[in-house]
Regions:
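Short acidic/glycine-rich loops and adjacent helix/strand connectors
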Residues: 1-202
Length: 202
């Protein structure tokens, strides 16, 4: 009723709530990549923080049809892993991820082995995060003291701490891991569904 009343406020002629359609978050992402493309068939890989529960999905698009085939669910999320490092390097979560990505070329990926203690990456690119290092599922911060101890520093406070080579190397390392996962996922789903075209969304 609340939604119906809000719609009536915007459109006095609105009569019924029967036509309201809530589209799945990841299906919407996949549609935004596949349907505007020139492709008649493609496998669509979507990765983000979290939709309803899905964090990574594989869909197959053919002509005007799109079907999600498999999902990875919260709290295992490549997007939230990236956001955890956004937080750790002193940038704002859900807006500063581009800064972390922009910082990556200035560093060296020397912390990849340590990051792999946080995430179990399978050969097909699927993954699971070790929740012992994170707070985002249960707390008010992205990471915790175990995460800090792994890398030897607390999260950077942007109010009084400058970006150092350490933060550049951290950024480079998480970028490297993110790319490794996306490449493995892309190769495995291309092989599994025997479709050469790939759309990315998220």
């Amino acid at each position: 009723n609340l939604l119906f009343n809000k719609l009536k406020e915007h459109d006095k002629n609105y009569k019924s709530d029967k036509n309201i359609y809530f589209s799945d978050h990841h299906l919407s992402h996949a549609a935004s990549a596949f349907f505007p493309s020139p492709l008649e068939e493609a496998v669509v890989l979507t990765a983000d923080g979290v939709g309803e529960w899905a964090t990574t999905t594989v869909a197959v698009g053919k002509n005007n049809k799109l079907e999600i085939k498999k999902e990875i669910h919260f709290p295992h999320s490549l997007g939230l892993l990236y956001s955890a490092f956004t937080y750790y390097t002193g940038f704002k979560v859900n807006s500063g991820e581009y800064k972390l990505m922009g910082l990556a070329p200035y560093g060296s990926p020397i912390y990849c082995d340590k990051i792999k203690k946080l995430i179990d990456i399978k050969e097909d690119g699927t993954f699971r995060l070790d929740q012992n290092y994170f707070n985002y599922a249960t707390g008010l911060t992205m990471t915790n003291s175990k995460f800090d101890n792994l890398f030897g520093q607390k999260p950077r406070d942007p109010r009084n701490e400058k970006i150092t080579q350490f933060h550049m190397d951290i950024a480079s390392s998480i970028q490297c891991i993110t790319e490794e996962i996306m490449i493995k996922l892309s190769r495995s789903i291309s092989k599994e569904y025997k479709i050469k075209n790939l759309c990315l969304a998220g």
